[in-house]
Design a protein with these regions (language model features):
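N-terminal (or domain-start) structured segment
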Residues: 53-147, 185, 193, 209-236, ...
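A ligand-binding cleft/hinge motif common to bilobed small-molecule-binding domains
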Residues: 126-137, 198, 202-207, 234-267
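Short, low-complexity disordered leader/linker segments with a strong preference
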Residues: 1-59, 354
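An extracytoplasmic/periplasmic, membrane-proximal ligand-sensing/linker region
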Residues: 59-61, 206-210, 294-354
Length: 354
């Protein structure tokens, strides 16, 4: 648009729209009035279009990123939740596994996704650890915690110390005594540095004063397979990941990082009860990019709650050994912030792990 000022007719302001449209406007009042009218009309049209899109949400399939391979807790929870949300939303919710870096790769992809409601994330508690680890190592962050908005927590279980059923260790005492006698000889698998399987083992090692060798994998599924195949000696993971193998007599659980008794493994003692001040919980929860419009965020929040109350979804999750412990968005956000604060100190104690 060109603004033409005629010096001989200073009271007249002419607006010329090049390449068609309005050719000439005479008079300052008329020009400004039409300009304002055009701007308001365009703004209202855009707002109306956005409102219509929000009201119609969703109009296509939604991608649920799972930042770990199949077989681990995030994937175990994500699949029945996605199915239940699909029924409520009237559109498919499609699982996409993006593993690596203790879940950081997939979490980063979700954080950078377009905030339009069509990308959601089923994360584990490593979400509160990885940003702290990035800062400690001085590396470019894979994502920032405030880039993801908590929508719903589904599970929160203490991890368990698991070994093969044919291993020489029948209890935690034997395991720790052997680790003290042979520093670095016992190895354990994890889902990656600073992940939900690495952190609890480091907490135990520091508490017990032992040294073990860490072997990272891309997720709990591959790590369990490696342990069953004799490639690693032990691991810490959620009960849901190993319960089927415990029932089949292939895996023995020595203890857990919680308090009291586990409903799925009532005969397993906590590390605290056995004299080791080691505590850790592996939670799973749904997140969306922080810039997601509020009406869309609330629609996803409602669908996430429906999934938490869905009988089929609850049965599937609970039958794996992880009872549903649902938290709605506001309470889950407080929970995540508290967990992040606690993990700051844990990461500092673990130190740099390349």
């Amino acid at each position: 648009m060109k603004l033409i000022h005629n010096a001989q007719a200073s009271k007249s302001l002419r607006l010329q729209l090049t390449r068609g449209g309005l050719a000439l406007l005479n008079g300052l009042g008329l020009g400004l009035s039409l300009s304002i009218g055009l701007s308001m009309g365009l703004s209202m049209a855009l707002m109306g279009n956005a409102t219509a899109q929000t009201a119609a949400f969703p109009t296509k399939s939604i991608t649920m990123i799972v930042p770990f391979p199949p077989g681990g807790l995030a994937d175990i929870v994500a699949r029945p939740v996605a199915e239940a949300m699909s029924r409520d939303l009237g559109q498919p919710v499609v699982i996409e596994n993006k593993a690596g870096a203790g879940g950081g790769i997939g979490m980063g992809v979700a954080a950078r996704a377009k905030p339009d409601g069509y990308t959601v994330l089923m994360a584990l508690s490593s979400l509160t650890v990885i940003p702290e680890a990035d800062a400690l190592l001085g590396r470019s962050p894979m994502f920032l915690l405030n880039e993801l908005r908590p929508i719903a927590r589904y599970t929160a279980d203490p991890t368990v110390l698991a070994v093969r059923a044919d291993s020489p260790w029948k209890n935690v005492k034997e395991f720790i005594e052997d680790a003290r006698k042979r520093p670095g000889a016992i190895n354990y698998g994890s889902s990656g540095n600073y992940g939900t399987m690495h952190v609890p083992m480091e907490i135990l090692a520091q508490t017990a004063g032992v040294k073990m060798t860490h072997i990272p994998f891309t997720g709990a599924g591959p790590a369990v397979v490696a342990m069953l195949g004799g490639q690693i000696d032990a691991l810490s993971t959620g009960p849901a990941t190993v319960l089927q193998h415990v029932k089949a007599g292939k895996i023995r659980v020595l203890g857990h990082w919680g308090n009291g008794t586990l409903a799925s493994m009532p005969d397993v003692s906590s590390l605290k009860d056995l004299g080791f001040n080691a505590e850790y919980a592996q939670w799973s929860g749904l997140f969306i990019p922080s810039g997601t419009p509020e009406p869309i965020a609330q629609r996803l929040r409602a669908a996430a709650k429906v999934a938490a109350q869905d009988t089929k979804a609850r049965d599937i999750i609970q039958n794996t050994g992880s009872p549903v412990q649902y938290l709605d968005s506001p309470d889950f956000e407080k929970y995540v912030q508290a967990d992040a604060k606690r993990m700051t100190d844990v990461v500092k104690k673990i130190g740099k792990v390349e």
